[in-house]
Amino acid sequence: MNFSPNCNRAVSEQRGIDCITFLAENHEAFIAMIILITGASHTGKTVLAQRMLEKYRYPYLSIDHLKMGLIRSGNTDLTPENDDALTEYLWPIVREMVKTAVENKQNLIVEGCYIPFNWRQDFDEQYLAQIRFICLAMTEEYIESHFDEIISHESEVEVRLVEADCTIAGLTADNKRYIDGFRKAGEGERVVIIDGDYEEAIKI
């Protein structure tokens, strides 16, 4: 499994790229492989991770599960609403788990929104060679025309509370933040833009 390096054109043109574009045919050639999946809320990170688990038999770690375990156990006073603070708190833990998996030649999918834009600076080349990265993001047009459908799928893989404050404006701003943030960090070619057929966009 590998990721195609030439998807930046599609990102700049705001056209959707399906996830299979990122995947090479022979994933078995890799002894160890870490796949990082991030993106705005409701973009389908957990759905994609679950599908990769089923297809490639890679275990996956939900950063949301780690977050809630730490919050519920009283190990932090942060709340689920403290996004930036949670990224600062959770990422050092997650990155060391990733390093441990690479060192032990273990495959792992990590999914969640708490991956910083500059995540690469925390890994030496020996680790980066084994890490692949995807960010899922929706265009404003897609959100406006599919908002009810997006909300209806928010518990497709795992049960979660309906976000009463989730609005078109908020979702649009969140997705734009991810697109702009990862572009500025040099990750533009790794952003999967969802602006048409959702199933085609996240197909693996």
Region roles according to the model:
Residues S41:
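The conserved Walker
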Residues Q130-R177:
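A glycine- and Lys/Arg-enriched "phosphate-lid" helix/loop adjacent to the NTP-binding pocket
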Residues K176-I204:
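NTP-dependent small-molecule kinase module
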Residues I37:
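Hydrophobic anchor at the beta1->P-loop junction of P-loop NTPases
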Residues G44:
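Conserved glycine(s) of the Walker
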Residues L86-L128:
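Glycine-rich phosphate-binding loop used to anchor ATP phosphates in small-molecule kinases
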Residues Q50-I93:
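Conserved substrate/cofactor phosphate-moiety recognition/catalytic segment
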